Amino acid sequence: MMQLRKFFENPKKAFCFFCFAIIILFTAYRSVNDFFYGGGYQWQETRQTANMAEEVSLSELYGADYEIYPFGINDSTAAVFCTESIGDTMKEEKNFLRKIVLYSMKSGKNIQEILLDHRYFGCSICDYEGGTDILFYTRDRLEQNCLLWFRWDKQKNQMIQILDKTIENPFSDYTLIAEGKSAALISYSAEKNELQSISEEEARPFLKLVGNEIMDLQVESNGTDILVMEKLAEKAQFRIYRNGRSFRTRPLAENEDCYSMHLLKNGALLYLQIEDAGISEKRLVWWPYHGDEVTISTGMLYRGISDHQNTALWNEFSQSGAKLHRVYIDEKKCIHEVLDLEPDYAALPQITLYDRKNRTANIFLNDFQKMGMIPLS
């Protein structure tokens, strides 16, 4: 005690101690504040008219019989796949996956073309640093359900086939998610209550799930964390896993239904339908890792939601017109931007982010016949 008293009797030492204590307290406050409110956001809503910068006629490139879907973009190349519908009526109509194409935006020519002949039932697209993977749900000539897994290596600018696998389980049991700087093919094992990573040779444990008797499961990833929607016997809920452990949960209310979910850098976008007193409303909700959720938009319909790590882009339809929305994470802020669409581009069937790192433009299809770019501020 005597030594401590002598220490404080020295004005210089006492002043230094006081300053040091202030720094420690301030650092501790910032750490605690970041822990609880690190998922905070600020609305920085801007409005402008979206103008088309470049436009390509897909029907001239690939023929009017095909429907063309973009699934990956960089500054010089578009990756698309082509399907063809055969049959006169909806009951007899069959959809076939015909080709996968890498198209040069600079030269206007195909870089690579892979021809296929499978019945097409949908796909799962996974974008990550360095590449884009696409999983096709198909049926072969023997009427067997097949998974076709392709990888677009953006550095080599080439499509590579990863997997051609016949399956017995439903297509809905399989999806692609980002896993670090690559992608993983994930399947849910109800017997072991875990997600499994599927390869040609084996299925290995990927994530042990919390809870039992999961009836249905949807999975999303931002490359490091996993978002699942669990449908249990009596309820449904969203759960985020971090480092293999349950990190945060959000119950799905009885009057809520989930159309889609998108896990970004420090939060999730949940596209929900709310039933209230006989009135149905579609709602896009931002659910941050820390802090309270916020409703971003309540338009009539959202289409083409595309997400990648820290950016989500989607098209909104409402009675007041069509708009292009962008939400992106800048450090610890969630910034929301709105672009009013010209009437010619008011009905965009599909939107894919372009130049994802710099968030400068997007590419889309107009009536599945045109492909173009819209610069973003």
Predicted features, each with a name:
Residues 4-9, 13-127:
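N-terminal "mature head" segments of proteins
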Residues 54-61, 109-115, 158-165, 202-209, ...:
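A short beta-strand motif characteristic of beta-propeller blades
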Residues 64-72, 118-127, 168-179, 211-220, ...:
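Repeated scaffold domains used in trafficking and secretory/extracellular systems
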Residues 75-77, 130-132, 181-183, 224, ...:
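Short coil/turn segments that connect the beta-strands within blades of beta-propeller domains
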Residues 80-82, 134-137, 185-187, 227-229, ...:
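Residue position within the beta-strands of beta-propeller blades
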Residues 88-101, 142-150, 191-197, 234-240, ...:
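Structural motif
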Residues 105-108, 152-156, 198-202, 241-245, ...:
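Short loop/turn segments that connect beta-strands within beta-propeller blades
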Residues 346-377:
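Blade-level signature of beta-propeller repeat domains, shared across WD40, Kelch, NHL, RCC1
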